[in-house]
Amino acid sequence: PIIISSSGLTNSAGKNKKLAEDGAGAIVLKSLFEEQIMLEADQLKDPAFYPEASDYLEEYIREHKLSEYLTLIKESKKVCPIPIIASINCYTDSEWIDFAKMIEEAGADALEINILALQSEVQYTYGSFEQRHIDILRHIKKTIKIPVIMKLGDNLTNPVALIDQLYANGAAAVVLFNRFYQPDINIEKMEHISGEIFTVSYTHLTLP
């Protein structure tokens, strides 16, 4: 079976219906990015806002994005006779469980998990990034019954060992490899930001 991966091609029920009609074996919906939700909230915040107003704005944007994504799942399920796989990309542990529960309730056939965290701490412990994959998988498996698929990046030092541990802890499948947005640095604010990403030949891809 040919599975259509998460992209702009899978961000509407109409596009997904056409992909199913053309022979796709399954469809992975356009990923829901937690950091994108947070970025939009930050861009709309005003320094003059009270803390309560900023919190309300962030929660409003979060709920709006989640509602749109759940609607995409439901509408795609109505028009597609093939499996519809949701995809989430988060960087805080607290959000994974809430996202996963709502996605299962919306009717997704499976859930793809993307994990990305910039390791900038001086006291970083080797192996903690790999362990984070396992811990998040365990937490999600305790709360939902649909298959959980782990999507891995290409910068792991020992992907075979990690994949073995993911299967041992209940992963239904593993996707190789994810191409994350490349981080950049705002030299004026000295902050991490997401870099631009364009279609280029494989030889021009940058490594993290």
Kindly label every feature range from the protein language model.
Residues 203-208:
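Conserved small/polar residues in nucleotide/adenosyl-binding loops
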Residues 1-169, 175-201:
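Active-site entrance/lid segments in N-terminal catalytic domains of soluble metabolic enzymes
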